[in-house]
């Protein structure tokens, strides 16, 4: 062998390549030593730091891509990154003080501001406060009069008291106390026939304690409980609710697209659960089928003579409906249903929302009902 043949030169691997990460480990090590030169920094500290930053960046990009897809955009914009951070609770806490350039702001519209809008169909609700009592000359003259001028209370008969109590009873019965604790009503709007549409914010784990007469459960043809809404209902209702769903599956399953079936809500605060087979986004006439699904849910609630019903957001799980499109179709179907019907047992329709993006979309779309 000749002495000229030496060892092959090995290409140097960077610390990032050896650790299996993309972010520069050596640069992070220099930054850590620069600011904290007093402390001893281990070799694995910048590797762990690079891995965490890389994971957070990938998570934000994935959520931003979902937001761009829901808004029917081909590219990710700073607005989508802002929505991605706002929709994730942990990322929102981590990046609370971070300002994203050209990201815009999240809508936070108070119900009082929405109630002042004027429109043809919507009826603004104003709370009338009693006028303050006037202290005039009568009070002064009463003091001068001494003991003789005593304040006399107007006598009310028993019949008038009974009438007042009856009026209070009827008003309380028509206007319900609300969906219960843990549910915040953000805004509301009244339609022509008196039906009240309310945007309600809560956590998905509280859906079992919502005090309404009917809850809509978007599902598949097999009436399974594999999606988020179904899992939350199963967790709240327990074995009793699961057995009720199994009996419904045997008697009325499988459901056709846009078909609705009603079951008892065992273990839940609501009286009934309306299971509906929602269409898949991208299928033929999917928007028309979703509109038909919502109308069938309302008809099923009216058949049971329910007074209140709650709709969760329809872009759930595997159907991949864009949030903007689903909100537009939902409000259009509900408004058309009550316009076509001369009378209805339903008085309150709640939209149960869980994330800030859906709230902003529904606030925007409900405001458009005034201009129609």
Curated annotation (Swiss-Prot):
GO biological process, one term: establishment of protein localization to chromatin
Region (Disordered): 114-182
Modified-residue entries (N6-lactoyllysine), positions: 7, 9
Primary location recorded for the protein, binned into one broad class: nucleus
UniProt keyword Ubl conjugation present: yes
Positions with biased composition (Basic residues): 135-161
CDD domains to which the protein is assigned, alphabetical: HFD_H2A, Macro_H2A-like
Residue location of crosslink Glycyl lysine isopeptide (Lys-Gly) (interchain with G-Cter in SUMO2): 239
Residues in Macro domain copies: 184-370
InterPro entries hit by this protein: Core_histone_macro-H2A, Histone-fold, Histone_H2A, Histone_H2A/H2B/H3, Histone_H2A_C, Macro_dom, Macro_dom-like, Macro_H2A
Residues in coiled coil: none
Compartments in which it is found: Nucleus; Chromosome
Keyword vocabulary terms for this entry: Chromatin regulator, Chromosome, DNA-binding, Isopeptide bond, Nucleosome core, Nucleus, Ubl conjugation
GO cellular component, one term: nucleoplasm
Domain annotation Histone H2A: ranges: 2-117
Expression by tissue: Present in liver, kidney and adrenal gland (at protein level). In the liver, present in cells of the bile ducts and parenchymal cells, but not in hepatocytes. In the kidney, present in proximal and distal convoluted tubules and in glomeruli. Present at highest levels in the parietal layer of Bowman capsule. In the adrenal gland, present in the outer cells of the capsule.
A molecular function (GO) term: structural constituent of chromatin
Subunit structure: The nucleosome is a histone octamer containing two molecules each of H2A, H2B, H3 and H4 assembled in one H3-H4 heterotetramer and two H2A-H2B heterodimers.
Function noted in UniProt: Variant histone H2A which replaces conventional H2A in a subset of nucleosomes where it represses transcription. Nucleosomes wrap and compact DNA into chromatin, limiting DNA accessibility to the cellular machineries which require DNA as a template. Histones thereby play a central role in transcription regulation, DNA repair, DNA replication and chromosomal stability. DNA accessibility is regulated via a complex set of post-translational modifications of histones, also called histone code, and nucleosome remodeling. May be involved in stable X chromosome inactivation.
Designated name of the protein: Core histone macro-H2A.2
């Amino acid at each position: 062998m000749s002495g000229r043949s030496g060892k092959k030169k090995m290409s140097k691997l960077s610390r990032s390549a050896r650790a299996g990460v993309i972010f520069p480990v050596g640069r992070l090590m220099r930054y850590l030593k620069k600011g904290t030169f007093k402390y001893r920094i281990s070799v694995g500290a910048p590797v762990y730091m690079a891995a965490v930053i890389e994971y957070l960046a990938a998570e934000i990009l994935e959520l931003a891509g979902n937001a761009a897809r829901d808004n029917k955009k081909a590219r990710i914009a700073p607005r989508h990154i802002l929505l991605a951070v706002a929709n994730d609770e942990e990322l929102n806490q981590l990046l609370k003080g971070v300002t994203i350039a050209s990201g815009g702001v999240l809508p936070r519209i108070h119900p009082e501001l929405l109630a002042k809008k004027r429109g043809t169909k919507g009826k603004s609700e104003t709370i009338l406060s009693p006028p303050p009592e006037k202290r005039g000359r009568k009070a002064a003259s009463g003091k001068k009069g001494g003991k003789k001028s005593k304040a006399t209370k107007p006598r009310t008969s028993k019949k008038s008291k009974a009438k007042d109590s009856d009026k209070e009873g009827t008003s309380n019965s028509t206007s319900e106390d609300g969906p219960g604790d843990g549910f915040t009503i953000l805004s509301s709007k009244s339609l022509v026939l008196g039906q009240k549409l309310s945007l309600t914010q809560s956590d998905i784990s509280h859906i079992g304690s919502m005090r309404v007469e009917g809850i809509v459960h978007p599902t598949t043809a097999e009436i399974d409980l594999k999606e988020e809404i179904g899992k939350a209902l199963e967790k709240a209702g327990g074995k009793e609710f699961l057995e009720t769903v199994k009996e419904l599956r045997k008697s009325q399953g499988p459901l056709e697209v846009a078909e609705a079936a009603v079951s008892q809500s065992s273990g839940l605060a609501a009286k009934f659960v309306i299971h509906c087979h929602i269409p898949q986004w991208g299928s033929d006439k999917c928007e028309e089928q979703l509109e038909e699904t919502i109308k069938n849910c309302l008809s099923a609630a009216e058949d049971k003579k329910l007074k209140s019903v709650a709709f969760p957001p329809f872009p759930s799980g595997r159907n991949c409906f864009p949030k903007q499109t689903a909100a537009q179709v939902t409000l259009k179907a509900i408004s058309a249903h009550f316009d076509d019907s001369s009378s209805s047992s339903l008085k309150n329709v709640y939209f149960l929302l869980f994330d800030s993006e859906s709230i902003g979309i529904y606030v925007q779309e409900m405001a458009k009902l005034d201009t129609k």
